[in-house]
Amino acid sequence: MLFRSAQLAAQHAVSAPHHGWWRDNTIGATPQANGTTPSWAEFFRERRLRPQLALAVFRGFAALLEAPGERLLEGVEALLGSHRPQPALLHGDLWGGNWLATPDGEPVIFDPAVYYGDRETDIAMTELFGGFAPRFYQAYAAVAPMPPGAELRRELYNLYHVLNHANLFGGGYAANARRMIDRLLAELRT
């Protein structure tokens, strides 16, 4: 059974005037701040990356992540460039473990970390831990194609989830987060 990309695209078509949500929630067991902002770059930097980096420093990853993470925070606007996405209703934690099919074959998503933001974040997350079937992405792109620059943004967006996993589970994820930060900083230098 394939999670239905048309349903996800329809969910992403639901919009709001600002990025964020009316209340804070969690991403896994980690608090997730959702205060609204009109700017996607500001929201992603201040409500997603900065809190996860601060928590990583608190959890003992300062030597590995603090200085490069701060440099990356300064470059978020440059990485996003002119990308100004319409706030879309997001699942927020959409990976293969957060959907299943009912006995009659209907897909159901669960364990959301809901907010309004760039729809690309949901698609990026689906690719982080193994991904969905290729036809899912083909069908989604047929309904809602990805704009130019999505591949670079995918790395930035998935950094949030890798940092969260570092904060929840430790070591290997922190090293992976550092590699992602280094690749993104290299993009800023080009």
Residue map of PLM features:
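Alpha-helical elements of Rossmann-like donor-binding domains used by nucleotide-donor carbohydrate transfer enzymes
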Residues: F3-A10, R71, G75, R135, ...
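A general structural signal marking secondary-structure boundaries and capping sites
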Residues: H12-H19, A56, L80, A144, ...
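A cross-family kinase active-site recognition segment
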Residues: M1-A63, Q86-P87, Y116
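Phosphate/dinucleotide-binding and metal-coordinating scaffold of catalytic cores
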Residues: F3-A6, P68, H83, G131-P134, ...
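ATP/Mg2+ or Mg2+-diphosphate-binding catalytic cores
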Residues: H165-T190
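Short, conserved active-site entrance elements at the starts or edges of catalytic domains
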Residues: A62-L79
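Short helix/strand-capping connector loops at secondary-structure junctions
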Residues: L156-H165
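Active-site Asp-x-Gly
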Residues: N34-R45, A54, H83-L89, G96-E155, ...
